[in-house]
From Swiss-Prot:
Record GO terms (molecular function): structural constituent of ribosome
Domain of life where this protein originates: Archaea
GO terms under cellular component: ribonucleoprotein complex; ribosome
Family statement: Belongs to the universal ribosomal protein uL29 family.
Gene transcribed to yield this protein: rpl29
Protein name: Large ribosomal subunit protein uL29
GO biological process: translation
Signal sequence, renumbered to the chain: none
Keyword presence, Ribonucleoprotein: yes
Length: 66
């Protein structure tokens, strides 16, 4: 997910996307703990980075509102 795409979203949409990604991350981690190998090991890393991007831009938007 690109930062420009995130900046176009509202804070509510960002919150919703964060919840979705955290659920997806939990599912991927559960697969790993069961001993299965992931098709793409970069998935977890990419999800974590997307969450970080979303949180960063959310904070930027909240600062602008003040």
């Amino acid at each position: 997910m690109k930062p420009s795409e995130i900046r176009e979203m509202s804070i509510e949409e960002i919150d919703k996307k964060i919840r979705e990604l955290r659920l997806e991350l939990a599912k991927e981690r559960a697969v790993l703990t069961m001993g299965a190998s992931l098709e793409n090991p970069m998935v977890i890393r990419n999800i974590r980075r997307d969450i970080a991007r979303l949180l960063t831009i959310k904070k930027e938007k909240l600062r602008e509102k003040r």
